């Protein structure tokens, strides 16, 4: 079956072949295409994601806009692209999580059981907008609003190194 409908492809397919300009970009199960993208195109094509240019610091650490972050992927190239899905970014309550960054809520979009947050994150060398998904109940119960200061965690297992 050939389709351009992402939802249809994810729900009906056992395997997906994702093509970009007539070339196979990635092939795999719907879960692999979503959670283990191999390229920035794949990550952006299925769902929403955050993409960052990153410099290799070691085989498991990267620098994004001057901030050093742990990453569970084995980093091979000196410069790469890193993706993280909005639902994998967590608000840090204790500060004990890895990869903690401070930011300011710029916009909250109520989507029913979820709220999409647009956060201006303070990396060391610049501020960057990041998209996050949170449970509505958590945001409402903790009185998090536009212009609230938050600490977020970019969890190491969720940072995926992809080809540009």
Residue ranges of model-derived segments:
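Hydrophobic Walker B segment
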Residues: 10-13, 45
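Short, glycine/charged-rich "phosphate-handling" switch motifs in NTP-dependent
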Residues: 15, 27, 36
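Catalytic metal- and UDP-sugar-binding loop of GT-A-like glycosyltransferases, i.e.
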Residues: 18-19, 84
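Short acidic-hydrophobic catalytic motif
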Residues: 31-35, 43-46
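Non-catalytic connector elements of ABC transporters
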Residues: 49, 60-164
């Amino acid at each position: 079956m050939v389709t351009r409908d992402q939802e249809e492809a994810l729900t009906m397919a056992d395997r997906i072949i994702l093509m970009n300009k007539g070339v196979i970009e990635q092939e795999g199960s719907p879960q692999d295409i979503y959670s283990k993208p191999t390229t920035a195109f794949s990550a952006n094509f299925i769902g929403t994601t955050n993409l960052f240019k990153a410099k290799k610091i070691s085989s498991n650490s990267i620098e994004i806009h001057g901030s050093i972050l742990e990453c569970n992927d084995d980093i091979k190239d000196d410069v790469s692209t890193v993706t993280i899905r909005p639902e994998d970014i967590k608000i840090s309550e204790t500060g004990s999580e890895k990869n903690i960054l401070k930011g300011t809520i710029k916009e909250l979009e109520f989507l029913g059981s979820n709220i999409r947050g647009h956060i201006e994150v303070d990396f060391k060398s610049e501020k960057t907008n990041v998209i996050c998904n949170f449970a509505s109940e958590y945001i409402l119960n903790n009185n998090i609003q536009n212009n609230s200061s938050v600490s977020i965690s970019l969890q190491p297992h969720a940072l995926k190194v992809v080809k540009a």
